[in-house]
Every structure is written in C-alpha cells, then in structure tokens.
Amino acid sequence: MGGWIDIGHEGFSGYMALPESGSGPGLLLLADAFGVDGVVRETADLYAEEGYVVLAPDLFWRMERRVSLDRTEPDRARSAGFLRRLDLHRVLQDIAVALARLRTSFECSGKLGVLGFGLGGRLAFLTAARADVDAAVGYDPAGVQDALDEAGAVSCPIALHIGETDEAIAGAAREAILASFTGRADVAVYTYPGCGHGFADRLRPGFDKAAALMAHSRSLSVFKQAIGPQYDLSALWEEHTRLEFGARDAEATMQTMVAEPYVNHIPTMTGGVGYQNLLRFYRDFFIPRTPADTRLIPISRTIGTDRIVDEMLFCFTHDIEIDWMLPGVAPTRRRVEIPLVAIVRFRGDKLYNEHIYWDQASVLVQIGLLDPRLLPVAGVATARKLLDESLPSNGLIRRWAEGG
C-alpha cells in the first residue's frame, strides 16, 4: 500500500501510504526511537485504510538513513545512541519540511494531523505547539512534562495516551500534564490501567491489545472530528445487510469489507478470518443456511467514530439447519425471536469486523432443547420484554415475590 518517497534535499525521505481512493486528509506519522520500522509502516498502512494520506519521515536520516530497528538488546542500545545524538532543533525543522511536503502533495486533499509514538509522541506535542496542524495525537509522550511551557501554544485538538505504569511519565509528570490543559475541552489525556510504556507496540512485551484498540478508536475520534474523513457508517452497514439478507450475494457482501476482514458470532464461534475464509463462510454456511423468513427488527442504533452498535430482534422459523447459529441441530420448525446485538467496526468506508451476540440459551429454549424449569433461562419472553418494558421483571428470582 505504501512506499518510500523523497521529502527534501540531501536524502531526506519518508514512507508514504495512500488510501484506496488515492486522496484524503494528511497525517504525519512520527516514529518511536526504533525508526521507520515494520510497526511504523504497518501503522501508516492502517491509517491509509482509514482514509488518510500518511507520511512517516525518517527522522534519524542525518545520522543514518532509513533506520529500522527491532526490539533486541543490541538494537535497543543503537536506539539509545540515536536518542543521545538527536538534535531536537534540526528534527523539528525536518518535521516542518515533511509537513510542507505533505501539504503540497496532490494526494493530500484536506487538513493535516500529526500522530506520534514514544519519541514521536513528544514531537507530536511540540509540532502542535509550533506548527500549523489541525489535530495531534501522542502515545507514550515521555518528555512532554518538560515542555509544558509550550502547552498554551497548542491551539488544535490533541489527545495523549499514557500507560498507567509508564515510569517515564509517572504520577507527578502526568498530573503536571493534566494541570497544563485544565479547562480545555479539546484536549484529552487518557490513562490506561496496568499498561506501561509502548503498550500499543505489538513487538514489546507489554503490548496490550485491548488498550491499543481503545486508544486507536480515541485517536480516530480526534482526527475525524478535526480533519475528516467522514463516512455514513449507517448507510454502509445497511448496504452490507441488504446484500447479506436481501440479495443473498456472498461476493457482493465481501465487496463492502476490507481486504482481510473477520466476523465472529460469539455464542457459537462461527464466522471467519481473512477474505477466503470469510467468503466460504458466507457463501456456503451463512447465506444459504439462514431461514428464508428471517426478519431483522431494529430496536436501536448507536453510531460512533469507527463502529456501529445495532440492537435488534432476530426472528425466524427453524426450518433448515442453521450452521452458524445451531450447528448440527436438525430443523424443529419452531418459531424463534431473540434479541441480538451487532458491534460492527469500520476502516474508512469498509467494514472491518463484526462481533455478533445473542442469548443462545433463549434460542435453545424456544426450539425445545433446553428446559427453562431446570435452569435460570427464558425463551421468547426475552424478546417480548425488549419491546415492552412494562412486562414483569425478576421472574427468575425466586425470593422476589416474597416481599419488598
């Protein structure tokens, strides 16, 4: 998706990644102390999928060109050496050159943001204070606490992501950062419990996937609100479900998704990871194995920065074997109505993943395979109460009727 380009004179270069559309808002990606390595290039490609024109400049080029280090002890020592020799003034000059290159590129069709990790997190803060950018995000921004005299110069929205146990930005430093932005509605400082420095770096021992995903969504929120791009996620999801349940076209359904999507029906762990796997699932096990009389009744829809949470009633007659919901269970011809929740995540204007939840016990009760007299479970009543809140609550709590 991306490749190296020349940024300025004398060999200053950077890795540029473009969105599928070929153009979009600009995003300057500032690397950690390991250079423009595989993780940085993957991050650039990821944000390109989100719709950005991404440029990751080689900030160590004056010492050694196109540095790409791993996390081994020898490379960590080399990284520390680069940091000791780094000329912050000249690096910020190089960032200004990179911003100008990005701003004037014909692919960049909108405003500019800056995103940084580690060393790059601090540089993102300084860039927001000293340059003309429209949004900034910094991960693990060690050293920001020593530059808070510039906080007042930051006029754009900014978010900082800090691990709770990051010793480089410990309690007092974190409190100083928070105090510097008191009263700023466009500034967010997020702390991630139990996480250390580099929690979003998949190559570090302290990588925390859940925290990294949360931080990514928060970062997207900053950028999308400030610089775009904006997509009609509801319309994209409606088209996906139309192709899935209406047209029943597996190939067309896949065209609404990213190149390597995944779907997980949580109660039965059915779905697929990757294009070929998921295409096979849709074509052979989902679309032809969903009852013809299936109805999706919308209850509520919450639309976020990069995802939709859809609450619905899923209604059908169990007249075929439903591989994805009731694998191996012969048709009972019973009617089923269940509350179902779909959490759908997007990358740019494509679906990236789906997490689908429902109460499998309620399904089993309604088709006669589970006796509600023996377990604290309910059948179609769960669907009925979703539509009518006046129906009785707490019927499964035996002591509820005793008083109160």
PLM region spans:
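N-terminal cap/leader regions of alpha/beta-hydrolase-fold enzymes
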Residues: 1-253, 261-262, 267
